[in-house]
Regions:
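Bacterial Sec-dependent N-terminal signal peptides
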Residues: 1-23
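Extended hydrophobic/Leu-rich segments
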Residues: 6, 346-347
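Glycoside hydrolase catalytic-domain context in secreted enzymes
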Residues: 15-346
Length: 348
């Protein structure tokens, strides 16, 4: 199915064919020059597609957004026919025909179910873990999925934390090696049977106080870099296509809007050049942390280094107005859009 959707995009739009024959940065430069501000912001917009799974594609608001270039990615759409139909809208009906990313949580297998990640880590069998990710990628890509929210490389020491089973335990060395293996398994050589990995949750999500999910984190920089950051650094160096920021606060600032975390460390120190997506609704949840209204949260998230908004609808609702008000520069929108386009076009 993935091959048929990609062939569809090539047949319908020579623009995407060019992406395979000229340097990606040149292609994206040309594409950005053709995009309106609203279309650029649309590429930063990730929305849920559960209504499509249970209903008709063309009756979903997502179809209208895709047709008007206001949508960059969708999560939780299941079914070959459903994904193909929405992808056809994006490549046939939108002005520029940019295809969509289709994301899914693929934690320990897709159709073939493997042991939970914590159990897999007990094996220390990196070859088997990589093979499991490769099988999951093959199965997911056959259904039209091209982006998976995995691996989760959060170091977790407190068994009270409810998501400890999704990670690799407390050892930063082992967690780093497993993250690398899963990225290799998922992404491979960017072929038809591969998917883009999304490393999560950056960062310190597994260190929530008292093991309470979403809770605050307060620790020294030394402990961060020695114990909690190594798997993320290893994943960045392994070429993971995307990172997902965490819900928790770091040094009193929500991770989604924390420039030190997202830019100073991930971008500048580790030289990561993939794109950053929020966790589900995280920009909207920043309001509860006292950052202001939804527009203020969007501006802070973008300034911090966030590239894609997952399901807050915050970028879509507020960034154009923020540009007009001088709160956000068009160059910031372009930078985020470029990151999303460069990585998504490789993996679609």
């Amino acid at each position: 199915m993935k091959k048929s959707v990609f062939s569809l995009s090539l047949a319908c739009l020579s623009l995407l064919a060019t992406a395979r024959t000229e340097p990606m940065n040149t292609f994206v430069d040309n594409l950005l020059s053709k995009m309106t501000l609203e279309e650029k912001i649309g590429q930063l917009n990730l929305l849920p597609g559960g209504d499509i799974t249970t209903g008709a594609v063309m009756k979903s608001p997502l179809a209208d957004l895709a047709a008007n270039g206001r949508l960059g990615a969708v999560l939780n759409v299941k079914g070959v026919d459903k994904i193909r139909a929405l992808q056809e809208v994006a490549v046939k009906k939108s002005r520029l025909g940019i295809p969509l990313l289709f994301g899914q949580d693929v934690i320990h297998g897709y159709q073939t179910v493997f042991p939970i990640p914590l159990a897999q880590s007990c094996s220390w069998d990196l070859e088997a873990i990589e093979q499991g990710a490769r099988i999951a990628a093959r199965e997911a890509s056959a259904q039209g999925i091209n982006w998976v929210y995995s691996p989760m490389v959060d170091i977790a020491l407190d068994p009270r934390w409810g998501r400890i089973a999704e990670g690799n335990g407390e050892d930063p060395f082992l967690g780093s090696r497993i993250g690398e293996a899963m990225i290799r398994g998922f992404q491979g050589n960017y072929g038809r049977e591969n998917v883009m990995a999304c490393v999560k949750h950056y960062a310190l999500y597994g260190a929530a106080e008292a093991g309470r999910d979403y809770n605050t984190v307060d620790m020294s920089r030394q402990r961060m870099f020695n114990q909690y950051f190594p798997p993320f650094k290893a994943a960045a160096e392994a070429g993971a296509g995307s990172f997902m920021s965490s819900f928790n606060v770091v040094d009193g600032i929500p991770a989604t809007g924390n420039r030190w975390l997202l830019t100073d460390v991930l971008r500048d120190r580790w030289h990561y050049d993939g794109f950053l997506v929020t966790d589900y609704g995280a920009i909207g949840e920043m309001v509860a942390h006292g950052v202001g209204d939804l527009k203020a949260a969007s501006v802070q998230a973008l300034h911090a280094g966030t590239d894609m908004d997952m399901c807050s609808d915050a970028f879509a609702k507020t960034l154009a107005e923020a540009v007009k008000a001088g709160k956000v520069g068009v160059e910031e929108i372009d930078r985020a859009c470029r990151r999303v386009l460069e990585l998504s076009l490789i993996h679609i």
